Amino acid sequence: MAEIPLYFVDLQDDLDDYGFEDYGTDCDNMRVTAFLDIPGQDNLPPLTRLEKYAFSENTFNRQIIARGLLDIFRDFGNNEEDFLTVMEIVVRLSEDAEPTVRTELMEQIPPIAIFLQENRSNFPVVLSEYLIPIVVRYLTDPNNQIICKMASMLSKSTVERLLLPRFCELCGDRKLFQVRKVCAANFGDICHAVGQEATEKFLIPKFFELCSDAVWGMRKACAECFTAVSHSSSPGVRRTQLFPLFIRLVSDPCRWVHQAAFQSLGPFTSTFANPSRAGLYLREDGALSIWPLTQDLDSGFASGSPAPSSGGNTSPASLTRSAKPVRSEPELPVEGTSAKTSDCPHSSSSSDGPAESPVESCVSAGAEWTRVSPETSACSKLSDMNDLPISSYPGSDSWACPGNTEDVFSHFLYW
């Protein structure tokens, strides 16, 4: 069975029993499922070996099998008898006494359903006889982690009508802090399930309460899911409400809270960027991905800064209407430099010609910036950085003048 792919990244040299018993939870990123295609001492075929580990007494073995179910379906889905055996394993795992195994299985149900829909002609039968009963049973699962995972599988109207009111009540539960902690840990999943409008109307106020909770574990959980909440909010709410709230978490006196906030800083910052300009975007599942830059970036620069050939033909009035300069907050003065800085570089008047207007100066700076390649620009900036006062850095001025704050941030991420 050499064609069977292995599911993890690195293969360890020694796998005495071709299993996971000696590796514990640290092998999440290891390639430890070699038991499927490496003949072991038991000389079992791959499918029988799969059953052995799926029904192992070791919880971690069963977790790994549940986590790799999609690949298992790809391997054994062509043979009808093997497929039915795998479906029986899925049913057995769905009834596992260990909540972590059921949670792993629940996360695999949507991709498994998509795969079976594309590859099985009898998908309606498989859906009604196997998958739907599992989903219905998990809706009443006693473990709250599994119920929270179910929210992403329901429609927005259903979640908002049935789950959202109760979830908001539990967020304010003052009897047991463990209840609020579970709500905080799964806040991002609920925001994604109900959508932007309900998030801003009902959940953002509750999120503010949880971020100000006296128990530091609540604030830490909020810092960990901050990116998901930001992703479900509009740009206005993101700037005016979530950004100051995140600053509070970064400055939290508890080291565990501000450490979690710093770990979320990069993903949270990326939610402010324009994907076509910055090259980054968040997928539906909250994962940070790369946006293709080739055409979008060129068009973005062309729209953000006027072309050099047309710079002289554009009037200052039309420029102020199309691209309003952004006033940045004054920076703290540095010893030896003046604290007064201008938003756009002004050209001093001379006897050779009339003085250049502030807007035209901004336009020329932006156009010059677009003509410089990233490599040349980076080298020139670094070589001249120590010789320039703070107010003379062309990077900040050329970013701030042509566009809005989102463009400034996008340029910063790109360069």
From Swiss-Prot:
InterPro entries: ARM-like, ARM-type_fold, HEAT_type_2, PP2A_Regulatory_Subunit_A
HEAT repeats, residue ranges: 86-124, 163-202, 203-241, 242-280
Highest taxon of source: Eukaryota
SUPFAM superfamilies the record matches: ARM repeat
Region (Disordered): 301-362
Database matches in Gene3D superfamilies: Leucine-rich Repeat Variant
Stretches with biased composition (Low complexity): 301-318
Keywords: Repeat
Function per UniProt: May be a regulatory subunit of serine/threonine-protein phosphatase 4.
Name of this chain's protein: Putative serine/threonine-protein phosphatase 4 regulatory subunit 1-like
